[in-house]
Amino acid sequence: MGARASVLSGGKLDTWERIRLRPGGKKKYALKHLIWASRELERFTLNPGLLETSEGCKQIIGQLQPSIQTGSEEIRSLYNTVATLYCVHERIEVKDTKEAVEKMEEEQNKSKKKTQQAAADSSQVSQNYPIVQNLQGQMVHQAISPRTLNAWVKVIEEKAFSPEVIPMFSALSEGATPQDLNTMLNTVGGHQAAMQMLKETINDEAAEWDRLHPVHAGPVAPGQMREPRGSDIAGTTSTLQEQIAWMTSNPPIPVGEIYKRWIILGLNKIVRMYSPVSILDIRQGPKEPFRDYVDRFYKTLRAEQASQDVKNWMTETLLVQNANPDCKTILKALGPQATLEEMMTACQGVGGPGHKARVLAEAMSQVTGSATAVMMQRGNFKGPRKSIKCFNCGKEGHTAKNCRAPRKKGCWKCGREGHQMKDCTERQANFLGKIWPSHKGRPGNFLQSRPEPTAPPAESFGFGEEITPSQKQEQKDKELYPLASLKSLFGNDPSSQ
């Protein structure tokens, strides 16, 4: 952090901290913005050390400026931060970011005019790499370096065809000829299916170029170059000298840039195939930090085949809509005009250990409260206990068994001697209003005597026959258990025979 924060020091740092982020806003630049810019440059494979000088800031701005219209919000924020830092290095007085960007663009326009004037005065053509001018004044081609090819192959091996491959290809192929671009494509060993898709896209674009730029009838005039066809732009039917001549003619025909656009168009289709996840499916997990969610969101957004207006709408709508409930509540409270920096600052603690502990405590309190309510509804909640009262001294907090006061004589209820409390007749009435002493028999609401039943004697219809003891026992069993035998149900019961 110290190395990153050492970009500015002394008076420049004071000037940096006086510049406002927005016109008329309260927030101002701080060290954390320099640290963030350094990390973003590392993420875009740029050297953070360039921030220490105004020339380095110019180089960074030159790399970022082509991506401003089609880039993400992070690229725009990085561009604005570097532009403000450039004004601080050049000691240009600015009040806010907007004024700094305007001042920087004015400086760029002035330098462009000077360059154009110098080119017109010397009547020289552009000398962009890899086409350079030798000591004899001739325009020669400088072949692409093995280091550049190695970096390109390494990106393909590590990233396959993820969205960041496209800006990496664009940076490595700056000013390249069609022959250089074909060399870069031929170094890709694997992913031949993707390469075949790329060839089909290039052939389609070449056919479209031939349709829109038909060849003029008749021979080419002496001293003039022929117009490039689609296959010439792709480098299959043109030589390196012809490509250099087209790119350095006046006016130039940028065959390298045209071919580069075709390749990027094909790479976009490949990235779409290798990244099948739709931006609609990117949702923040319940415990995922908001920063990681934003990274995944913009990475998928780069692979979307849509215009910049559609991507802006996706960012404004889906970024908030697909956040988890905790972050969504915070983002809606910020309002629709909140910047990405404000969103990430507001949601910084969501998903961390402190936030998890707070959410868990709230959930536990809710569960405990609901369980208490259920117990009270079911009648299991007994409420506060009643205080214990001593029968001996009449005080609360202990029983008569543990009472230290002198034992009270007689009944503890009426105070009279001669009986105990269990035999006390005072206010011991039943619900009929009658006093029931325990020594006078049964209570008044019970039957005081139990009469014996007076059933008539059993009649005998034996007509004098003699009854054997077994028959007597059978008759007695029938009287006691009328259904014990199966005769009444199935006739003769074989078990009784």
From Swiss-Prot:
This is Gag polyprotein. Gag-Pol polyprotein: Specific enzymatic cleavages by the viral protease yield mature proteins. The modification Phosphoserine is found at residue 145. A motif (Nuclear export signal) lies at residues 16-22. The modification Asymmetric dimethylarginine is found at residues 385, 407. The record marks 129-130, 360-361, 375-376, 430-431, 446-447 as: Cleavage. Residues 12-19 are annotated as: Interaction with host AP3D1. Transmembrane segments: none annotated. A motif (PTAP/PSAP motif) lies at residues 453-456. Residues 214-222 are annotated as: PPIA/CYPA-binding loop. The lineage of its organism: Viruses, Riboviria, Pararnavirae, Artverviricota, Revtraviricetes. Residues 274-360 are annotated as: Dimerization/Multimerization of capsid protein p24. A motif (Nuclear localization signal) lies at residues 26-32. Residues 102-125, 437-497 are annotated as: Disordered. It comes from the Viruses. Keywords: AIDS, Capsid protein, Host cell membrane, Host cytoplasm, Host endosome, Host membrane, Host nucleus, Host-virus interaction, Lipoprotein, Membrane, Metal-binding, Methylation, Myristate, Phosphoprotein, Repeat, RNA-binding, Viral budding, Viral budding via the host ESCRT complexes, Viral nucleoprotein, Viral release from host cell, Virion, Zinc, Zinc-finger. GO terms for biological process: viral budding via host ESCRT complex; viral translational frameshifting. A zinc finger (CCHC-type) spans 388-405, 409-426. Belongs to the primate lentivirus group gag polyprotein family.
